[in-house]
């Protein structure tokens, strides 16, 4: 190649790289918005459909509380359709579902969020290209099952189940979870040394601060003779316990996320993890 041509190309490449670096926005600890995320949809056994949502809080450190209303609404049918009002930092996959009827057809829902003065919206529907199977991936892996007692019932997948508890602001509230999983390994991968299931607790809604004794409590594996009942053929099962302390009275919703070895967001394939929620009524 002619040296002059090579020099021009090299300078052009350096210029393009410099230009790209100029427009790369650095991460921000705070002051950024929250973007709703449409993960997809899946059919339910009764003929209805579940639309799965997550979000992306673009702040590295700032968690946000956005009450239901003008700054946090899903319409039509809203403003409240079960969405979070507390937003953890960064990307959060498949945090909740909205159920729509079997005749929903080509209609749309729109989730609107206003955070730090920045508005973001996502319109969602039942586009066939966005159909999911959050209960089994291509390798046959299934999400962990979650129960609130050792006897169950046990439910898996993003819709989950709900428990109601009560307490007061001066005493920690005990939180106990039983899990069961098929301990499926990604084909061709080495069996991980980490536990087959990991749990993460977080505040989903509520007026005050929530402090967990451990938001990622270890799961104590149960012996085969004491394994949970009601979850199909568990290879791994166990119990995890923690407590939550609430800064003030009010109605709270806590979320517990159970991940298997596929990790957050199921490597982008929307399987295999499970959610469950605990509604806690806190008195003085």
Label each residue range with its predicted role.
Residues 105-117, 254-256:
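Short, aromatic- and glycine-rich surface loops/edge beta-strands on solvent-exposed regions
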Residues 13-15:
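N-terminal signal peptide c-region/cleavage motif recognized by signal peptidases
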Residues 49-55:
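Short, well-ordered beta-strand segments enriched in hydrophobic/aromatic residues
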Residues 1-6:
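Bacterial N-terminal signal peptides that target proteins for export
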Residues 93-99:
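Ligand-binding face of N-terminal immunoglobulin V-set domains in extracellular IgSF glycoproteins
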Residues 18-20:
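Boundary at the C-terminal end of the N-terminal hydrophobic targeting segment
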Residues 102-105, 247-249:
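Surface-exposed, short loops/turns at beta-strand junctions within beta-sandwich domains
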Residues 22, 28-38, 42-44, 55-57, ...:
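Extracellular/lumenal mature domains of secreted and surface-exposed proteins
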């Amino acid at each position: 190649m002619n040296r002059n041509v090579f020099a021009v190309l090299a300078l052009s490449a350096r210029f393009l790289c410099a230009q790209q670096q100029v427009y790369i926005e650095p991460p921000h600890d705070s002051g950024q918005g929250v973007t709703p995320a449409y993960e997809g949809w899946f059919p339910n056994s009764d003929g209805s459909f579940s639309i799965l949502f997550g979000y992306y809080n673009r702040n590295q450190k700032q968690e946000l509380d956005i009450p239901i209303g003008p700054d946090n609404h899903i319409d039509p049918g809203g403003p409240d359709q079960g969405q979070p009002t507390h937003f953890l930092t960064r990307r959060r996959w498949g945090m909740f579902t909205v159920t729509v009827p079997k005749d929903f057809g080509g209609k749309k829902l729109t989730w609107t969020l206003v955070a730090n003065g920045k508005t973001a919206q996502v319109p969602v529907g039942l586009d066939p290209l966005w159909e999911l199977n959050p209960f089994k991936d291509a390798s046959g892996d299934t999400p962990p099952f979650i129960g609130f007692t050792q006897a169950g019932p046990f439910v898996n997948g993003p819709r989950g189940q709900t428990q109601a508890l009560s307490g007061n602001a001066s005493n920690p509230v005990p939180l106990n979870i039983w899990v069961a999983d098929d301990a499926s390994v990604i084909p061709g991968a080495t069996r991980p040394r980490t536990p087959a299931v990991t749990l993460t607790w977080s505040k989903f809604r509520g007026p005050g601060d929530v402090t967990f004794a451990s938001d990622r409590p270890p799961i104590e594996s149960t012996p085969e003779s004491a394994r949970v009942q009601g979850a199909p053929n568990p290879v791994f099962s166990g119990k995890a316990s923690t407590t939550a302390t609430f800064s003030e009275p009010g109605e709270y919703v806590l979320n517990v996320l159970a991940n298997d070895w596929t990790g957050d967001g199921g490597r982008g394939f929307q399987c295999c993890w499970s959610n469950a929620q605990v509604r806690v009524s806190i008195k003085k």
